[in-house]
Design a protein with these regions (language model features):
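Glycine-rich N-terminal loop/short-helix segment of MobA-like nucleotidyltransferase
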Residues: 44-57
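Surface-exposed cleft-lining segments at the edges of enzyme active sites
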Residues: 54, 150, 170-187
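Amphipathic, non-transmembrane alpha-helical scaffold segments
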Residues: 61, 65, 86, 90, ...
């Protein structure tokens, strides 16, 4: 545990076989600790009002900014020094990363942004309050959409007021642009970037910070820790929470 109380920081440790062996040159070599920290963004305006944000570019609340600053100070307190950082292209994650890096005096490190670290796309649920969605769908169906690993929400259509396809950040995605995602689809969208951009940096000995979103981090934890599909529903990452240090498989 890196901290307790309001920060509710969850520490998750994993044994690294593949990465440790490659770093040391053999499968039987002793494993070196390889660090990566997963940081969920601070509270957003739609977290506070309990609306489905998905890919809508919602900013942080004052509380969220404070959570991000506290996360950075906590990282500094525990001696985390990063070589690079990664974040989604959504401002709640971007601002959280900026703030945490500033608070830990690491604002100068290289940062990479990618849509693949965006929050799960909630499709037609996007923008609805949890209360309105429950009234429309019923409590049981809404729970399936939210927590069922392979259950896709109804897709977002072009007449949706928050239609993702109109955003220039995503114009070149073509068929890769999601209209709504199950947790499984979110998992499958995140992993290519994980293996192409993050894992090679860790293999190269770099210390990495990733600022992302609740469902993205849940999917990564599932992948790293082998969490069963049905058990993933019980994992929740608080806003402003760091998961780390991780030694990665």
């Amino acid at each position: 545990m890196l901290a307790s109380g309001p920060q509710r920081v969850r520490a998750l440790s994993y044994l690294s076989k593949e990465l440790g062996a490659k770093a040391k040159g053999g499968a039987d070599a002793p494993l070196e600790p390889l660090r990566i920290v997963l940081l969920r963004h601070g509270e957003s305006e739609w977290n506070a009002s309990k609306r489905f944000s998905g890919w809508v570019d919602i900013d942080l609340t004052d509380k969220g900014r404070l959570e991000a600053a506290r996360a950075g100070k906590l990282l500094k307190l525990h001696g985390y020094e990063f070589d690079e950082a990664h974040a989604s292209v959504l401002k709640r994650a971007v601002r959280t990363l900026w703030t945490a890096l500033h608070s830990s005096n690491q604002h100068w490190i290289p940062v990479k942004h990618t849509w693949r670290l965006n929050e799960r796309h909630y499709g037609a649920l996007t923008g609805l309050s949890k209360t309105d969605a429950e009234e429309q769908l019923g409590k049981e169906m809404l729970l399936k959409y939210r927590r069922g690993y392979a259950v896709e929400p109804l897709p977002m259509t072009e007449d949706h007021p928050m239609w993702t396809g109109a955003d220039r950040r995503y114009r070149d995605l073509g068929p890769l642009l999601p209209m709504g995602e199950s947790l499984r689809q979110c998992h499958d969208r995140v992993l290519p970037y994980w293996y192409e951009s993050i894992v090679p940096s860790v293999r190269g000995g770099k210390q990495v910070l990733v600022a992302a979103h609740n469902n993205v981090i849940r999917c990564l934890c599932k992948h790293l820790d082998g969490i069963a599909d049905d058990d993933l529903r019980h994992l929740e990452i608080p806003t402003g929470c760091e998961c780390g240090p991780l030694s990665l498989d």
